[in-house]
Amino acid sequence: MDWVLRRFLLGSVTAKVLHDISCPVLTGVHLEQPPHHLPLSFANITCAVDLDCHSQETLTWAAQFASDLHAQLNLVHAIPALEPGFEIPFGGDWKSDVANLARSDLEKLVAATGSDVSGIYVQAGESRKTVCSFAKSSGADLLIIGRGSQDGIPGNLPTNAYAIIRESPCPVISVSA
């Protein structure tokens, strides 16, 4: 049965590894030219969460990893760039309300995990663009994202996560939760 599923997996060896195993996976940045030097440490780490049921495990792992490396940890979350439809009445500053609600949920997540984070950032936009843009602008040395299991398949990586790994300006560790 596994061979049937595998044959429908498109992409690289990386995609197959991310799909098949449940341990954290470090993926590098796709570069046309090799770098002149490789970073010897990860001092500025960003953890991106989507506030799903796996966010707590992802943040806990990221916080422990950052602590072990004596690194700064930032938490980022992308909210959809919602635009009101014709039939949906939005009042007041609803965009701020959505961002504040997400920030509140992130603060609760940080408190629940006891994580030490340097900053919590909520930005509107498409997940892959927002997360990768934040990683670049904040000078992140490493990005940590969650890799949940869907339909009982360990290691399954949502579409946004594949795009984040592919487009990240820095190495990415995807954590199976």
Regions found by a protein language model. Give the residues of each.
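Small/aliphatic-rich secondary-structure junction motif
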Residues: 40-92, 96, 115, 119, ...
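Structural beta-alpha unit
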Residues: 1-2, 111-143, 148-153, 170
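Short acidic active-site motifs
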Residues: 13, 105, 127-132, 160
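Short, structured interface segments
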Residues: 14-34
